Amino acid sequence: SLWEWGQMILKETGKNPFPYYGAYGCYCGWGGRRKPKDATDRCCFVHDCCRYKKLTGCPKTNDRYSYSRLDYTIVCGEDDPCKEICECDKAAAVCFRENLRTYNKKYMAHLRVLCKKDKPC
């Protein structure tokens, strides 16, 4: 769920997820369209595609899942029905950490009308 993913992002990046990633670029936040602006935005694009493909088995009304941290690694609950969603969220949080160096504040609260050319999953 959004809560668990937010906690993963905070632990991986040290950044508050909502101001930093809530409306970043063309894909971070609700919805998403067109071409990702940079590597961080691409993390969100891949995350959106991943979640869209992995919704089976996880109740749409409650997508909360269990996970833990082993050393510095996120471990999704093995028998959790939403494990695949957890794996999507984990991959995005790690992607954000790996791309902190190229994070660009000019894409925070980016206007979606400025996004160009459609890019399907």
Curated annotation (Swiss-Prot):
Optimum pH is 8.0. Keywords: Antibiotic, Antimicrobial, Blood coagulation cascade inhibiting toxin, Calcium, Disulfide bond, Hemostasis impairing toxin, Hydrolase, Lipid degradation, Lipid metabolism, Metal-binding, Myotoxin, Secreted, Toxin. It comes from Bothrops brazili (Brazil's lancehead). Its EC number is 3.1.1.4. This is Basic phospholipase A2 BbTX-III. Belongs to the phospholipase A2 family. Group II subfamily. D49 sub-subfamily. One of its GO terms (biological process) is phospholipid metabolic process. Optimum temperature is 35-45 degrees Celsius. Expressed by the venom gland.
